Amino acid sequence: MKKFNIMAVLLLFSISVLAIVPPDNVQATFKKMYPKTNDIAWSQDDGYYCANFVMNGFTKNVWFNAQGQWEMTQTDLVSLDRLTPVVYNAFTFSSYASWVAEDVTMVEFPKWQAIIVIEVGQDNVDIKYQLFYTPKGILLNPLTVSEKSPQKAKNQTEG
């Protein structure tokens, strides 16, 4: 029993040591933006602090720089039916409408318009695209994000 208690204490200690605690300025900016949010999981990626939480049924990732300035918010929309009618109609009337929507995310920025990103693929095909839509339903340049995209394959054979 003592061995189990010691193991549990060590596990809890290791988790608390690995937990990210952002600087006060980052936490202050976050609290101004989301004053009623609880259960926040903080992480750090390439110098940015990211608050991960659920709000109104949506998973959100809010990114801040080390100076405490908001950089972007990613909201996982889960499926196409959570899109605005304008973006939904733009997608359903596009040449990608028959493709499978694998991920739907809205990305908001402090100084730019929001972008809706729909990742699509096809059954039994390795090519995937990220489709970037404006809130007005305008499709921007699609981006190939496949593991075996032609550009990646070309780069691998040249290297």
Regions found by a protein language model. Give the residues of each.
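Positively charged n-region of N-terminal signal peptides that target proteins for export
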Residues: 1-6
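Interaction-mediating elements
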Residues: 20-159
